[in-house]
């Protein structure tokens, strides 16, 4: 890599003295620390404070004396080292602004924003920060004796100085107060401390005269001390590199480690480097490369459904694709776009239509697609798997080669080369370790590299080595054929060899074989059985036979555990697999999510998965018949009985290891299938062009107006809106109220539309009430006659305009964006709902960009209902491949990406690039002036003084996918740089253009000599004659290229034809409108599985009339209950009243209109809802299901347990785990009331504190009318409430508000306690003269936070627990009403603790 390229990233850094606190706010790391043992419970929490814990925490103030001494000695040394000359730093040693962006900002690495410079005042502002020492030393009496700080202030001020650092950034006074305070401090600096008269030998009058003339020598010491401080700062700057300032985890997160730099500068595609990182030392021979092509072809062919005549071309295509990947180093998009001819099998045939039509072409080409773009990713994945397979095989061969000098094994010789999977290689490795454990131990003495593997093998097989060396092994040989020979018999790999019976009975033979190791015949027989069973177990051919049968005849069944009996109820997602049985491997292959659900339930201990053979009995019998002798006698029967015992021993061991392998392989296969489905679904979301207004060309960016009511009622709560132009600029934003009835607001919206003329109105929200907003806006558009832009109607050839379209927007990206650090950085002054509307507008203008901006957060999207059963790393990788395909299909305007951060988010997905190389690209272009005029200059242009930005191989990958808009007025602008044509094919494109224009070689030469190489294509565009390329017969030209130059360019020529007519044409599908079901799910959170007809649901009564009632379901939709569906005996008003929560059966659900019909009739309620599962009659254990229902019923009777129901809309019949699962997707502060495990005089309230943190509040009920009624008095610790609503509002919601207040504080860190402590340490390393503190959430004790603080660079990090209580915070038994009071209280408490410590130590 050239030096000029390496200059693009600076390795070392000089830190600015005035670095803002905010530059470290997002940094976090890990350091294991001891947590305070705050009392808590996973079910219901106690409210008592742990006094012992408080004592332990206070003990944390004791500072190590060595630490104090070191700090003091260090200060003394620094004070002695004065007047050191300042050294200039080299440019490459500086931590430049862009590097700091990479570390400190939570926005994309390539986004560059000008940083505001901190203004420095005159000497008044430049006071010297207090030197840091140990906590105990701050208040030491020795300060008065040894104070040489150069200040005139008394030493008692040291305590206040230390404390000032804590207050530094918190709630400062206004500017005027601060200015006066600083001036007062400045004036106080040269204050005379006075001299001791007794030590001078002068009288008082003489001293006064001397002071008046000369001063006391300290008047200007503050200025000298300031100079000393600056020199000290310069010394700390020297030789600082990134790893000196930031934690390794932070550097890794920001891609700034040494390994990241190697990837960044190495001229190989970034994704290739990451995928092959584990195999970078693997060298493949040409034979192995050919073997890999065959291996991949054999794995892919079964799923391709190609005719037999295409098998050969398919194998060649796979080999060629591997060559492109491995040898040429080009990525999938490049191969698919520029080597497409190798993915197609073209066959030239005579045209049968020529007989009737002489003008018809003589030949036609029949093309068959061999490999799709998805197949290319599969080949790439299998390439990595083959490398893993090859590496393991090489290691096995190396071990065997060392053994071959002493022994030869036909099984290994034959089967190593036959192995086709990792499983088979592992079988051979196990066989080698078992069969040759003694030999491997001998090798270990001479080969330390094999020590680990050999030790493992020797330890496991020591007892069998003892048998192998003893006489007992002769009994093993007498039992008959070897396990390998038996496996050959079963597999019919050669002529059958039968076992021969010894002439003696087994017992008699055993008696003759006794020795010191096995002194009795019985011990000899037992040892022989164990030995032969182990040989069968270790036999690779036997395992192959078992594995083949389990894959072909295996059946999978589930058996619930005792834990799963009650936990997996009918509402649990695992109920679908609780009683499954007799599922074949083929059945699970078509429903991969089912097996993944089984595996997850098994991991949680809820079920056991049993894999067995459908033909188990026949399989065992076949195994025995091929092992038994064919003789008929008592002797033969005795020997066959021994053989049967051996088979029984070996069978169970073999089944265990094979079943484990089958389950692992099946899980991998099911994951691959589900990942493929996720990729396809995500690709569909990406494959959307911007919304296209009528009359516009697809791909045109629309002007958009977006509105949202969020969670609120649109008739009562504000409706946020944003108007965005076609360039993505926010023109206006604001709020409306009550667009349904307030005419002034309706007119304001109409005026906004007329003023800004949007092409479309988009609406979305978080609740079913959004449906009302949609209806209101649609009615307003119709009533006011609001129309979209004019367009040319092709039917009438006249201009017309239609009513403005109102559409519902998919808001999955906007929900993630509105509160994200990126959104706050983009729009710090806007509220979350406005940012939400901005994201909605951007989504309509380009969905792909919004998805790309998510980065790794893309896995937070609900792509597939079962994606939670997939490994997140695998899911992310597959989703990224879909993004890579789409980004390279659409292309990236590199100059737009340099100016627009949203476009720059696409760069990591361009072929050849990645996050690291995208950073390199942006930085390199900036160094070259910030603008790219041609694709070629990215690899350097010395004549124009352009440094190389990318290496040749990476450039070759990405060149055609980075386009540059053609400027006809710029003679250096090449129109081909604005097309999908690769620079390697520019000459071909120019030849096509010349032929289309009818220019001969002389005309071409004259044109190019005068106007450059791009002159011909420029002329084609200038003359507007692109359509002439359609007249060319490109097939003949393609044949000529293949015949004369061995270049297959048919598809490339077609691409050239298309690009010369419409450069970078929009190839995405049109913007996709949401379906009725998708809108319903988005606004209610319910799908057809979670809410459907027949379910019994909770309903809150809103209106009661004489003949019907209106209710509202938990999901927000309205329901209607007719009077005859309530009761035949009573009036509806006697049964229902407003505010009542009732149970009702859902009779009809209109998802389009968000309305439902319900019934409360007894006969309807008595019929429970049964979820239908798609399985065969013989695949569900109905008998076991009925038995379990009866068992649970009996248990409930015996324990007196009954399902409690509370008449409240927030009540759910959940346990703690179900409550947490339910609240997991809800916003923080949401609440569930549920039964308590403590009995019917308790209730439990679970509320969401933060993501993944839930508090369970125990509510004691007093003054109950009966066992199941809610108590008139509800007690939570020392708090008492009159009803549930009061408890929710004044207790839970009050605490949630305090939690939100603390988490919005700028001193709050989002990471764990370990990460926060790491952040404090990092901050202090970068700012050694400051003190700081931060809050973080205590995830182990919901409702608590940690207040972590570090008083000086050398002091330890301390942590105090902060408890959230209703309307306040509690710290050390003291309560504080808000965060500001809490912070000030902490500082006073800290000062008090330090004074206590000092007084106690005197």
Curated annotation (Swiss-Prot):
Keywords from the UniProt entry: Chromosome, Nucleus, SH2 domain, Transcription
SMART domains named among the record's database cross-references: S1 (SM00316)
Entry's transmembrane regions: none
Compartment list: Nucleus; Chromosome
Annotated Acidic residues bias: 10-28, 40-52, 62-75, 90-102, 161-176
Residue intervals of the SH2 domain: 1209-1306
Residue segments, region Disordered: 1-199
GO biological process, one term: cellular response to stress
Primary location: nucleus
GO cellular component, one term: pericentric heterochromatin
PROSITE patterns, per database record: S1
UniProt feature, compositional bias: Basic and acidic residues: 123-135, 177-199
Pfam family, one: HHH_9
S1 motif domain: residues covered: 1094-1161
UniProt function note: Histone H3-H4 chaperone that plays a role in maintenance of chromatin structure during RNA polymerase II transcription elongation thereby repressing transcription initiation from cryptic promoters. Mediates the reassembly of nucleosomes onto the promoters of at least a selected set of genes during repression; the nucleosome reassembly is essential for transcriptional repression. Essential for viability.
UniProt record similarity statement: Belongs to the SPT6 family.
Protein name: Transcription elongation factor spt-6
Lineage of origin: Eukaryota, Fungi, Dikarya, Ascomycota, Pezizomycotina
């Amino acid at each position: 890599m050239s030096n000029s390229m390496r200059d693009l990233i600076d390795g070392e850094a000089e830190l600015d003295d005035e670095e803002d606190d905010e530059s470290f706010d997002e940094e976090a790391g890990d350091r294991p620390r001891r947590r305070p043992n705050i009392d808590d419970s996973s079910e219901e929490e106690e409210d008592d404070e742990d006094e012992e814990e408080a004592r332990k925490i206070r003990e944390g103030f004791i500072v190590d004396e060595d630490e104090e001494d070191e700090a003091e000695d260090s200060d003394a040394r620094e004070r002695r080292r004065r007047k050191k000359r300042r050294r200039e730093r080299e440019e490459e040693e500086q931590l430049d602004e862009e590097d700091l962006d990479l570390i400190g900002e939570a926005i994309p690495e390539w986004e560059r924003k000008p940083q505001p410079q901190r203004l420095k005042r005159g000497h008044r502002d430049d006071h010297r920060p207090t030197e840091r020492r140990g906590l105990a030393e701050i208040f030491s009496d020795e300060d008065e004796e040894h104070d040489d700080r150069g200040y005139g202030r008394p030493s008692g001020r040291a305590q206040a100085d230390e404390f000032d650092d804590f207050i530094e950034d918190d709630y400062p006074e206004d500017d005027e107060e601060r200015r006066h305070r600083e001036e007062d401090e400045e004036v106080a600096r040269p204050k005379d401390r006075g001299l001791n008269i007794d030590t001078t030998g002068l009288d008082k009058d003489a001293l006064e005269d001397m002071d008046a003339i000369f001063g006391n020598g300290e008047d200007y010491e503050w200025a000298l001390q300031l100079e000393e401080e600056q020199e000290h700062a310069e010394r700390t700057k020297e030789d600082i590199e990134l790893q000196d300032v930031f934690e390794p985890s932070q550097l890794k997160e920001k891609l700034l480690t040494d390994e990241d730099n190697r990837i960044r500068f190495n001229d190989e595609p970034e994704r290739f480097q990451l995928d092959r990182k584990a195999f970078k030392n693997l060298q493949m021979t040409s034979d192995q490369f050919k073997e890999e092509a065959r291996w991949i072809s054999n794995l892919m062919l079964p799923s391709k459904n190609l005719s037999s005549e295409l098998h050969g071309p398919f194998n060649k295509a796979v080999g060629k694709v591997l060559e492109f990947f491995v040898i040429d180093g080009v990525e999938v998009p490049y191969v698919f776009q520029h080597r497409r001819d190798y993915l197609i099998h073209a066959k030239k045939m005579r045209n049968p239509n020529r007989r009737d039509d002489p003008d018809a072409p003589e030949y036609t080409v029949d093309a068959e697609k061999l490999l799709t773009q998805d197949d290319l990713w599969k080949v790439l994945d299998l390439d990595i798997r083959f490398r893993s397979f090859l590496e393991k095989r090489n290691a096995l061969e190396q071990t065997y080669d060392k053994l071959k000098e002493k022994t030869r094994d036909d099984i290994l010789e034959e089967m190593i080369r036959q192995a086709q999977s990792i499983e088979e290689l592992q079988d051979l490795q196990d066989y080698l370790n078992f069969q040759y454990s003694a030999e491997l131990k001998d090798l270990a003495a001479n080969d330390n590299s094999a020590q680990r593997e050999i030790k493992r093998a020797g330890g496991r097989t020591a007892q069998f080595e003892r048998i192998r060396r003893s006489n007992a092994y002769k009994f093993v040989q007498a039992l008959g054929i070897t396990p390998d020979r038996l496996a050959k018999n079963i597999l019919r790999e050669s002529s059958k060899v039968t076992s021969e019976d010894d002439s003696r009975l087994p017992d008699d033979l055993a008696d003759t074989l006794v020795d010191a190791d096995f002194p009795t015949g019985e011990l000899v027989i037992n040892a022989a059985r164990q030995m032969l069973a182990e040989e069968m177990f270790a036999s690779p051919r036997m395992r192959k036979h078992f594995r083949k049968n389990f894959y072909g005849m295996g059946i999978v069944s589930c058996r619930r555990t005792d834990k799963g009996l009650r936990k997996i109820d009918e509402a649990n997602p695992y109920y679908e697999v609780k009683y499954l049985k007799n599922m074949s491997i083929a059945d699970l292959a078509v429903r991969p999510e089912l097996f993944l659900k089984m595996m997850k339930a098994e991991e949680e201990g809820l079920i056991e998965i049993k894999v067995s053979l459908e033909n188990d009995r026949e399989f065992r019998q076949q195994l025995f018949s091929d092992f038994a002798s064919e003789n008929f006698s008592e002797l033969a029967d005795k020997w066959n009985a021994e053989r049967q015992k051996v088979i029984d021993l070996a069978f169970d061991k073999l089944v265990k290891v094979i079943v484990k392998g089958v389950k692992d392989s099946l899980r991998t296969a099911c994951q691959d299938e589900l990942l493929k489905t996720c990729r396809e679904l995500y690709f569909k979301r990406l494959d959307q062009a911007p919304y296209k207004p009528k009359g516009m060309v697809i791909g045109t960016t629309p002007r958009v107006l977006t509105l949202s009511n969020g969670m609120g009622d649109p008739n009562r709560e504000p409706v946020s809106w944003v108007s965005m132009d076609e360039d993505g600029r926010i023109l206006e934003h604001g709020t409306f109220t009550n667009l349904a009835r307030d005419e002034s607001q309706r007119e304001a919206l109409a005026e906004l539309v007329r003023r800004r003329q949007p092409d479309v109105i988009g609406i979305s929200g978080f609740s079913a009430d959004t449906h009302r907003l949609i209806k209101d806006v649609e009615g307003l558009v119709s009533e006011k006659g609001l129309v979209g832009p004019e367009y040319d109607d092709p039917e009438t050839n006249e201009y017309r305009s239609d009513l403005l379209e109102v559409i519902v927007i998919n808001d999955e990206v906007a929900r993630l964006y509105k509160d994200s650090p990126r959104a706050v950085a983009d729009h710090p002054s806007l509220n979350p709902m406005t940012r939400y509307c901005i994201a909605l507008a951007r989504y309509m203008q380009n969905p792909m960009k919004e998805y790309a901006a998510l980065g790794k957060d893309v896995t937070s999207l609900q792509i597939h209902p079962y994606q939670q059963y997939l490994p997140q790393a695998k899911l992310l990788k597959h989703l990224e491949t879909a993004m890579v395909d789409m980004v390279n299909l659409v292309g990236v305007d590199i100059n737009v990406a340099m100016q627009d951060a949203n476009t720059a988010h696409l760069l990591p997905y361009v072929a050849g690039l990645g996050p690291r190389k995208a950073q390199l690209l942006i930085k390199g272009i900036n160094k070259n002036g910030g603008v790219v005029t041609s694709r070629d200059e990215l690899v350097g242009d010395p004549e124009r003084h352009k440094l190389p930005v990318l290496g040749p191989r990476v450039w070759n990958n990405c060149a055609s996918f980075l386009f540059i808009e053609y400027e006809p007025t710029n003679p250096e602008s090449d129109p081909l740089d604005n097309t999908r044509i690769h620079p390697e094919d520019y000459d071909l494109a120019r030849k096509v253009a010349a032929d289309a224009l009818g220019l001969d070689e002389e005309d071409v030469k004259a044109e190019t000599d005068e106007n450059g190489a791009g002159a011909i294509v420029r002329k084609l565009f200038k003359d507007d004659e692109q359509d002439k390329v359609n007249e060319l017969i490109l097939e003949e030209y393609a044949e000529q290229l293949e015949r004369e130059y061995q270049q297959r360019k048919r598809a490339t020529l077609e691409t050239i034809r298309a690009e010369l007519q419409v450069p970078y044409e929009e190839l995405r599908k049109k913007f996709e409108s949401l379906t009725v079901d998708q809108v319903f799910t988005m606004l209610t959170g319910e799908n057809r599985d979670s809410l459907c007809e027949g379910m019994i649901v909770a309903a809150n009564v809103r209106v009661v009339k004489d003949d019907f009632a209106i209710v509202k379901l938990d999901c927000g939709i309205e329901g209607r209950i007719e009077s005859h569906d309530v009761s035949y005996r009573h009036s509806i008003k006697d049964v229902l009243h407003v505010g009542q929560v009732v149970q009702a059966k859902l009779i009809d659900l209109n998802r389009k209109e968000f309305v439902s019909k319900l019934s409360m009739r007894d006969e309807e309620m008595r019929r429970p809802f049964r979820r239908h599962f798609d399985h065969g009659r013989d695949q569900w254990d109905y008998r076991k299901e009925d038995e379990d229902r009866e068992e649970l019923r009996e248990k409930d009777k015996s324990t007196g347990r009954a399902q409690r129901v509370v008449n409240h809309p927030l009540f759910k019949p959940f346990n703690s785990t179900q409550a947490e699962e339910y609240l997991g997707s809800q916003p923080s502060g949401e609440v569930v009331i549920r039964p308590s495990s403590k009995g019917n005089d308790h209730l439990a309230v679970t509320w969401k504190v933060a993501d993944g943190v839930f508090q369970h509040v125990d509510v004691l009920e007093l003054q109950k009318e009966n066992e199941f009624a809610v108590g008139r008095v509800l007690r939570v610790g020392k708090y008492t409430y009159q009803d549930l609503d009061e408890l929710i509002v004044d207790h839970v919601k009050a605490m949630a508000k305090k939690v939100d207040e603390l988490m919005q504080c700028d001193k709050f860190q989002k990471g764990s306690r370990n990460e926060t402590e790491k952040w404090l340490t990092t901050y202090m390393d970068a700012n050694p003269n400051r003190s700081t503190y931060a809050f973080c959430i205590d995830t182990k004790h919901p409702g608590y936070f940690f207040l972590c603080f570090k008083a000086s660079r050398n002091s330890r990090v301390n942590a105090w627990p902060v408890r959230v209580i209703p309307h306040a915070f509690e710290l050390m038994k003291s309560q504080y009403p808000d965060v500001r009071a809490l912070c000030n209280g902490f500082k006073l408490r800290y000062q008090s603790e330090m004074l206590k410590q000092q007084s106690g130590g005197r």
